Regions:
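C-terminal beta-barrel architecture of Gram-negative outer-membrane proteins
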Residues: 141, 520-527, 542-585, 589-617
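Outer-membrane beta-barrel translocator domains and adjoining extracellular loop/strand segments
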Residues: 164-179, 224-240, 256, 282-291, ...
């Protein structure tokens, strides 16, 4: 976009698609980046923002500190919402690497600003088919604009069917008087999943407000998740036996969401969001080992309610003050039958409150201070109410060297709540040596993070260097202990984790047609105490985009990884990944085909852990992680005046508190 000019605080910046504003980076897509993108994720990927990792295949957007929150015109968005964005309807993108105002509290924020229309409509169709195994993703949508109002209907169907995950596993269980060894080899695996969704949405937008109402329905069914395995036992007893593990799941979730953003005055805004959902989950597992049979059947009803309100006022000298109140509530009832009969009723609620103050100090310094608290409550029907108060704080200090360079330091304090599927008093049979058990008395996890970063936009080069230290107190992790002749797998919250991390991120624009992005990461993780686990790893990735007329070619790759899973306390080693794609874009058509790991037949995912009484190593392979290909076709037909493509802000995840075995 060599010819584009951007006016910023009375300074015109020419030829730059990255513009550093007071509290965020304004990213202006050029024609090449827009033309060769089919979705909102494609466009974000093409922008090659140095500190962002965008997986356009899975819709995951993250930065070094964690997952990035996505917004469209200031409204919080989910995967489908961004996936359904039409790139040519996007004016620009705001990247809040140090979120302030309504975005305060996020690790980082992306806000898509779209071109709004007042008449016309569209019909869109898109489909993606994987080559190498069965996976299809098909969507249809329509939108009608009339004045300040818009109405949309979106629907989709996703199906997967492949040979499942095959495992080779060695285990050692150290009982007081003897040791048992077990080798597991998968002989057959089958997996099938189907998902459907429907969304109805009405929106009214004026200069004073943006309000919407949305009704959604999600159905997610896994009719087949089967594994047949050969078990070889040695040590105390020596024998071989076959096992079969069959699981079925079915979830249905309707939800209603109301959203309103109000410009009270030119300097004051108020945002309110309320969402409620009901979920019906069914889970069945049958495990056989020789003539022994284990059965679990669970019916669950889950109610969820989320409410948030944000107020922000702009003060003099580019300062601002805001407040944020949130409450998240879940109530679940599960009826277990089979090996263990039980009724589990749990409610969990977390209330959070924050103040946010942003202060400019002279021309070079700025500070963002966000103090607050979390009040977490949960109660299992057989236990007393658990209550945890936590201090939360985000503070960022920025020194602006010049318009293209910054130094930044941050100190953050937070907390993390346990997953609702951990909080129960249930026992579940894993196999006839192991039991999985819930724990309703888990502590509140505390997070402490200190970071420093240098960021620069230097002509064609954009880069970032940063270092981060993180300490996690009362980390929730897997716990193993012996009970009679069984190994019990449960949960604990009395261990700490320390992370020392460093990163180099850069992107370079060789020409209008050729762009590249490079990331390098260093991770050093320590889990002191009982197990004294340490791991070091270096990870690098490279992405290259080349544009020529209506064609775009992408090549990407990342090195093998080694990381400690802070929940399982296992060291996980993942293989290198590489791939390429070519796309053709013309008017309303976007056609893309690609391949991942085209020269790799046997990608293996390795995992191992050593505990005082239980050690294991595991290698997993799956058809979906070997060499595969895909073809994706999208077409949009506009009628009347062209309109922005509707954004499906459905959350297609289905919540569940059911404790399941792997």
């Amino acid at each position: 976009m060599e010819s584009d000019n951007v006016i910023l605080n009375e300074v015109v910046v020419k030829g730059s698609s990255y513009v550093r504003k007071t509290d965020h980076v304004l990213v202006i897509p050029d024609k090449q980046q827009v033309k060769h993108a089919g979705t909102g994720y494609d466009l974000l990927y093409n922008l090659m923002i140095p500190s962002l990792e965008v997986n356009k295949r899975t819709g995951k957007v993250s930065t070094f500190g964690g997952e990035v929150a996505l917004y469209i015109n200031g409204e919080k968005a989910e995967y489908e919402e961004v996936q359904n964005l039409r790139p040519r309807d996007i004016k620009n993108i705001e990247y809040y690497d140090t979120p302030t105002g309504k975005y305060a509290g996020d690790v980082a924020s992306i806000n898509y600003i779209t071109k709004e229309r007042t008449s016309g409509g569209y019909v869109s169709l898109d489909g993606k088919q994987t080559i190498g195994y069965l996976m299809g993703n098909y969507n249809i949508g329509t939108k009608l604009m009339h004045g300040n109002n818009s109405y949309s209907v979106l629907g989709g169907y996703i199906t997967q069917k492949y040979d499942g995950v095959k495992t080779s596993k060695n285990e050692e269980i150290l009982f007081p008087e003897y040791t048992t060894h077990r080798n597991t080899q998968t002989t057959q695996a089958d997996y099938q999943n189907n998902q459907q969704y429907l969304q109805l949405k009405a929106n009214n937008r004026t200069e004073k407000h943006n309000i919407s109402a949305q009704l959604s329905l999600v159905h997610n069914e896994t009719p087949k998740n089967n594994n047949s395995e050969l078990l070889d036992y040695s040590g105390h007893h020596t024998y071989s036996i076959s096992s079969a593990n069959q699981k079925k799941e079915d979830g249905l979730s309707p939800s209603v969401k109301l959203y309103g953003n109000f410009n009270i005055t030119p300097k004051q805004t108020l945002e309110v969001t309320a969402k409620t959902a009901y979920t019906q989950n069914d889970y069945t597992r049958t495990y056989t080992e020789g003539e022994n049979i284990s059965l679990t059947d669970v019916d669950e009803e889950l109610y969820a309610f989320d409410f948030s309100t944000r107020y922000n006022i702009k003060l003099e000298h580019n300062n601002s003050l805001g407040a944020n109140l949130q409450h998240h509530h879940k109530v679940t009832s599960s009826s277990y039958t089979g090996d263990y009969d039980s009724w589990q009723h749990l409610w969990m609620g977390e209330t959070m409150f924050f103040l946010n103050y942003n202060q400019r100090i002279a021309k070079k310094f700025s500070m963002n201070f966000l103090p607050g608290f979390s009040w977490l409550n949960y109660k299992l029907h057989t236990d007393a109410r658990q209550q945890h108060w936590s201090l939360r704080m985000n503070s960022t200090f920025i020194y602006t060297i010049n318009k293209s360079q910054q130094l930044m330091a941050s100190v953050d304090i937070g907390n993390d709540q346990p997953d609702i599927s951990y909080i129960n008093s249930m026992d579940q049979t894993v196999d006839f040596l192991q039991i999985k058990r819930g724990n309703p008395h888990l502590d509140n996890t505390k997070l402490y993070v200190v970071g420093i970063a240098y960021k620069a936009q230097l002509n064609r080069l954009n880069f970032q260097i940063l270092g981060v230290y993180q300490k996690i107190q009362n980390n929730i992790s897997t716990d193993y202990y012996l009970e009679n002749d069984k190994l019990v797998s449960s949960f604990r919250s009395d261990m700490d984790v320390e992370h020392w991390n460093a990163a180099l991120d850069l992107s370079y624009r060789f020409s209008d047609n050729l762009r590249a992005k490079f990331n390098a990461r260093y991770y050093h993780t320590i889990i002191p105490g009982e197990y004294n686990i340490t791991d070091n790893s270096v990870i690098a990735s490279l992405d290259i985009n080349y544009y020529w007329k209506n064609l775009a070619i992408n090549v990407y790759g990342s090195t093998a990884t080694s990381r400690i899973n802070r929940f399982s306390l296992a060291i996980e080693k993942n293989p290198a990944i590489y791939g390429t794609s070519i796309s053709w874009s013309h008017k309303g058509w976007h056609v893309e085909t690609g391949t991942e790991n085209p020269f790799t037949k046997h990608n293996r995912y390795r995992e191992y852990a050593n505990f005082s009484i239980y050690n294991y190593s595991r290698i997993q392979t799956s058809r979906i992680n070997q060499r595969t290909g895909y073809i994706k076709i999208a077409y949009t037909f506009d009628f009347g005046q062209k309109t922005s493509r509707e954004k499906s802000d459905m959350d297609r995840n289905i919540n569940s508190a059911i404790m399941k075995t792997n």
